Structures are given as structure tokens and as C-alpha cells.
Amino acid sequence: MKNLEPWEAVIGLETHVQLNTKSKIFTAASTAFGDEPNTHIDPVVCGLPGTLPVLNKTVLEYAVKTSLALNLNVAEHCKFDRKQYFYPDLPKNYQISQFDEPLAENGWLEVEIAEKDKETYLKKIGIERLHMEEDAGKLVHIGSDRLAGSKYSLVDYNRAGIALVEIVSKPDIRTGREASEYASEIRRTVRYLGVSDGNMQEGSLRCDVNISVRRGPNAPFGTKVEIKNMNSFSAIQKACEYEIERQIDVYENGGEIYQETRLWDEAKQLTKSMRLKEGSSDYRYFPDPDLGPIEISKEQKDQWLDELPELPSKKRQKYVKELGLSPYDSRVISDEVFMANFFEETVANGADPKLASNWITSDIVGYLKSNKQSFAELKLSPINLAEMINMISKKVISGKIAKEILPELIQDNISPQKVVEEKGLAMISDSASISPIIEELIIEYPKEVKSFKDGKTKLLGFFVGQLMKKTKGKADPKLANKLISEKLNS
């Protein structure tokens, strides 16, 4: 991205997180994903006359826990409001949300920003509020990916009424990278809490970006534009970077920025105008008369606070300070809760932390990616990985042999000790066994021996390689190197 000086971007994110409750926010209808359209609806979802909503207690618990994890102040009482608008995805013609009395306000999230060729830094991003609301249905446009150009549209109400929390950041973000990392940290947090799977592909986590530019940090805010339709963290970063440059170009050419909603076009890598932005007054909010106010006691908040797990930011600090991992490795390990738990259990079973980190982030992650599996699907137990790492440390097997048996351990979760014994893969680590093989090599390669003695000392690697071939990788490489060097120099 080009140098923006003297311009500065001002960015805020509205993040919608679907909560993974089994039933919807105000009804017992299922929240299962991927089923036939309009199979998870009922009279409450459809807004039929005489139906009354009832708040799902688990939704409140998950929303409060998310608020506490994001350092928000949870209100002692809050209420639901009706947000009025007419659109086919809302069968009631209003959405139940929270307006002037949200569940929680004034929090923050510390984000680690790592940019290429730049020093990693921490950024504390303020969070304005978190509120609960119901999701809308989904329109499917036939013949186009959007309403314009489609032959006709169909609506699926399976998603309507699913519980959401909307997390609104303060305008503290200044770059596309910061926006992307902030959204990533939100996803890590809700996954660690177990309140959402955070899958952007399934719509479980959706981000809208509000962005403007101004001439320097002390200038007044410019006109903000909302960007939608970003289904990955890289798309968030690219959309922000494109929009920043677009707005600067408009201003520098004497143009005007309009308050509007724009869509990110992934194929063309640009934002396109969708509609002029509505203000909050257009929605005619008023308190929902069918839902009473919510009161949350201090005792209940304290209980939910005690139930919070260790969050990714704390794990990163612990891995660096207590276990000696690099900041990069600590980020990779803590990125996914299943990986972090697996790593910690491996270390608890006696494995060296750095070795455990290396095996997990390179070999195991590589295997899972090539087999299109997630870490949650890993069959290998931490006990067996720790056993394999300790066998390498104790020179029972070589690293080469460990790499060869790892796929079998992952597939069947069997003891590495058992595999090594059954296949005779134990490391040859005594001079008495290696020395006769070296004598064979001296006889087989007289020209190479002469060349070594004439000064071509790099041939030492050749002899070590031949010895490893003869022992099928089972010889101790350090011992082999030492014994061959002694023989050739004698």
C-alpha cells in the first residue's frame, strides 16, 4: 500500500457473532446449519399473530461471558428494542435488537500487529458496546450474486431468529492490517469461550467496516463509508486498503465522499456502491413490549467471570515468558484452542516445549492441511506425541525415523514405542555397531577416501549419507559423523 501521508484512516468494525446455541434466541426452533431451506421456522420466527418471544437463557450467559472477555462493563439491567424496517428477510418487518440500553459498554481488546518488514507491536482497540439481537433470514438471488441482475429471489428463514451478539469497536483502527487482526482476535476469543465457531464461510462471524480518512490525527473526522460482503480476514484488510486509497483520491481530485454502503467485490478487488446509508432514526426504534427488562446480578456476573477460560492473549504471554517460545510460535500455537490445549498437554506429559511447538506447527499442521483436516479432528494423543519427542531426546530414535512414523501415529494414535519395536527402528547409537559399517564404506569408496585425504573435506557429508543409507536412517548422525571423521583423518 502506498504512503498515505499526510492522510490518516479512521476505521471501526461492527462484528456480528452467531452464538452456537441449539435453539434460537426467542424460540425453541433449531439452529442447525446446512439443512433444507425453511425447515427451522415456527410461528415466533414468522411473526404470526398471538406469538410471544421468550429469551433463551444460554444466549444471555454467552453474551455476558463474551462481554467480560472483551473487558466490557456489563449493565445491571438492559432491554430489547424493535428495529423497524421492511425487507423480505424479516418476516415480522422488525428485528429485535438493543438500542439505547445495550448489554455491555466501554471495553477494549489488545491486538498484536505483525506486518511484513515491520516490527510487531501491540495495539489497544476500544470497544464501544456489545448487544444481543436476532439474525435475519437469507436471500438467495437466482441468476446473480446480488439483487441487481437476478431473475428472481428466494428467501430462507432458517437463519432468522438465530442469536447474535454485535460487537462495535471504537474508531481506533488505522490500517487494514489492524482491522484484520482485530477481527481475528475477536474470533479467537469467541472460539476459546466456546460461544461460537466463528466460521466466516458459514456466516457465523460477519464484519462490516466503517471507514473514513482525514488530513492528520488532529483533523476532524471525514464522511464515513460502510463496507460489507467480506468473507475472510484477508478480504477485510484488502477492502480497507482499497477504500482508504479511493477516498484519498476522491478528496485530492476535488470530489466528495457520500455516506453510503459499499460492497467488496472479491473478484475485482474493489468496493462498489450499493446504497446511501440510513441513519439510526430511519429504524424508528422503540422498546419491545413483549420482552421485559433484563436484570443481571453481581453474583451471576461473578460466577460467569470465574468460568472464563484462559484467553489467547494470556496464553501467548505465558508461552513466551514461561515456556521460552518465540513470539511467532506462541501466536501460531495459541491461534486455535484445540492446538493450544494439545500443546499444553504434550508439555505436561514431559515433552520439551520448543520441540513440541516445532513438531505441532510444522509436521502435524502440515499433515492435517494436506489431508484437509482441522486440528479438532486430530486422533494423535498428546501422550503419544510426548513419548515420541522424548524418544528422540533420549536417542532411542532419530528425527528422520520420527518423521517417517508420525503419519502412522496420527492415523491410528498408537504408541511410538510399539511401532519402533515392531519395525526395528531403534537408533543405532553404539560405536561397536557403526564402526564395521564405516570399514565397509572405506573399502567401497577408495577414490572418495583419497580425495578426502587430499583436502576435499566436504566429502565427509557423502560418507555420512552413505552410512545413513546402509542403516536406513537408524544410525545416530552425530556419532556417525564423529566416527567417520576419526577414521578418515587417521
From Swiss-Prot:
Entries under SMART domains matching the protein: GatB_Yqey (SM00845)
GO molecular function annotations of the record: asparaginyl-tRNA synthase (glutamine-hydrolyzing) activity; ATP binding; glutaminyl-tRNA synthase (glutamine-hydrolyzing) activity
Keyword Protein biosynthesis: yes
Keywords tagged on the record: ATP-binding, Ligase, Nucleotide-binding, Protein biosynthesis
GO BP term (any one): translation
Family assignment from sequence similarity: Belongs to the GatB/GatE family. GatB subfamily.
Name listed for the protein in its UniProt record: Aspartyl/glutamyl-tRNA(Asn/Gln) amidotransferase subunit B
